Amino acid sequence: MKFKKIILALACLSSPLYADQDQQLKSEIQRLQHQAEDLQAQLNRLQKQLANHKSSQQKHEQQAAAKPAEPKSKPTTKSGAAIEEKYHSSKVEVHAPDAHPESISFYPTALIADNRVVTYIAGTPVVSSPFLGDRPAFDGSDYIVNISSINRDVRLMQQRRRLYRAYQKIGYPIPNMPIISLSGKTEPAATFNNPFRSTNTDGDITLGSSELDIAAALNENVEAYIAIAYDESPPAIGPRVNNSAFNLNMGFVNIGNLDKSPLYFTAGQVYVPFGRYSSAMVSAPVTMNLARTKTRPVIFGYKSQADTGPFAAFYGYRSDTTLGRSGVGGVNLGYIFGFDNDINGEIGGGFITSVADAGGMQSTGSNVGTTFGGFGSITNGNENVRKTKAADVHGHVGYDRYNLTLEWVGAVQSFRPQDLSFNGQGARPQAAQAELGMTFMAFNRPASIGVGYQWTKEALALNLPKQRYIGVFNISIWKDTVESIEYRHDIDYGLTQFANGAAPPGLVNLPTLGTGKSADTVSAQIGVFF
């Protein structure tokens, strides 16, 4: 009897609960019925549209059969609209990596239909470098604009190979349209110094280096590249901003596919592969000032298909100097090595049949009507000089977060005294640098320091110091930027030393005299890269 009462009480209490559940189920059933009715209505509309489309298509086909279209012209309706081509519907898919996107470097994105790229999700591939989602370094050091100006064609060819390998790795067909990559930089800088030939402290604020790079990978084998750079040098006459102009810094076409062959070809306006000129400093090393040569060569090269191994380049171009034969050539040889991902580096050497076309030989920066201004100067120079051979030896090694750079470059024969002189004799200019660097984290940001020593010999006429002690601190406070501060101590040639160079016909340049003094310069720079 007692249990019957308990059961009766539970039944009375649970009846409202079941009633509520029944009401919820009825509401859910009604909502699903409304959705089903809406879907059925949509299906009926689509079937009606499909029937109308088939009827219209049959009518057009009958008209076309009765009255064929004229050759070489599309059939049209009475209204003049072109008849649509037959088509079919296909599934559109996007390949996604199995791993989390943060764990891989490349993840190109495209819409695929019938195993063909219909379109890239971002439209035609115009991307900011590095190519297609390659995760860049925090300081922007791996952007195209920061690739070494020497052998930039080889570096882009390697990048192009990594790009197309990424497509194959994730299962995408090779794009049938050019992939255009944009890169660039702006580097405003401020300097404070006390020059050799002045007792007053001087200072300047300038835009510094600014450049826009465009690399177009047409396919796996061919790439075109142009770099447009800002000319920061002040004009000879008028306000300094009057020379705020852009010019073609580099432009070339590279043909090669390292997956198929170690051979490649490059032609255009580039820095010839002579020297390395690697430095972490704000100021260019004296080796670069002396011998880096920009011209319009053809280059035939060899690059090991592995990341390490030998490389070679043979090149030729027409010289700017006019005495003797116009042709100049050279060779660059080297080897890239790496051991257990801890030690890596490069050793190499080069030879060029004339160093007179180098930027530091063509323009020394002297004022108009004063000392030797370079062979290319209209008022203080002359291109009618003998071609003088030069050589280069360089090495770079990195271990963990430390790196060491060594380089020597110089003429292997003397210039004629009337072309370039030192103490009344034909000059044989040389330059060398040694630089030690270390990377670390500062304030939770990537940073580096570097110290170096540089020297020159018989380069007084080129306005280069005899010795240089230099140090720099770099830090990336914000992504894709590098903030730098540099101290430089230059020592001039002695008081008893003098030099000169070729002058226009009938004129003589003022001699460049050593001062025996030293100069100190502090530079601050903000580099912004994309």
Swiss-Prot record:
Region (Disordered): 50-81
Domain of life: Bacteria
Keywords: Coiled coil, Signal
Record field: compositional bias (Low complexity): 63-79
Signal sequence segment: 1-19
Coiled-coil segments: 20-66
Recorded family membership: Belongs to the UPF0422 family.
Name the record gives this protein: UPF0422 protein lpp3030
Organism annotation: Legionella pneumophila (strain Paris)
